[in-house]
Amino acid sequence: MCMPCFTTDPNMAKKCRDCCGGNGKCFGPQCLCNR
């Protein structure tokens, strides 16, 4: 898990990807990085 994901933030998917170094996505309330 990289960071929490908030459905109210329209940029959350991008922030999650950036937090994961370009490869990650929101899954429920968590930002999960793809290894």
Curated annotation (Swiss-Prot):
One GO cellular component term of this record is: extracellular region
Q: Which GO terms describe its molecular function?
A: chloride channel regulator activity; toxin activity
- What does the entry state regarding organ or tissue expression? Expressed by the venom gland.
> What keywords is this UniProt entry annotated with?
Amidation, Chloride channel impairing toxin, Disulfide bond, Ion channel impairing toxin, Knottin, Secreted, Toxin, Voltage-gated chloride channel impairing toxin
**Annotated localization:** Secreted
One Pfam assignment: Toxin_5
- InterPro entries, A to Z: Scorpion_toxin-like_sf, Scorpion_toxinS_Cl_inh
- Positions carrying Arginine amide are 35
Which residues fall in a coiled-coil region? none
Q: Which cysteines are joined by disulfide bonds?
A: 2-19, 5-26, 16-31, 20-33
Instruction: Briefly state the protein's biological role.
Output: Toxin with unknown function in healthy organisms. On glioma cells, interacts with chloride channels (probably ClC-3/CLCN3) and MMP2 at the surface of glioma cells. This complex is then internalized via caveolae, thus inhibiting the chloride channels necessary for cell shrinkage and tumor propagation. Has been shown to weakly inhibit TRPV1 channels.
* Family that this chain belongs to: Belongs to the short scorpion toxin superfamily. Chloride channel inhibitor family.
Q: What is known of its domains?
A: The presence of a 'disulfide through disulfide knot' structurally defines this protein as a knottin.
Q: What is this protein called?
A: Insectotoxin-I5A
Naturally occurring in which organism (per UniProt): Mesobuthus eupeus
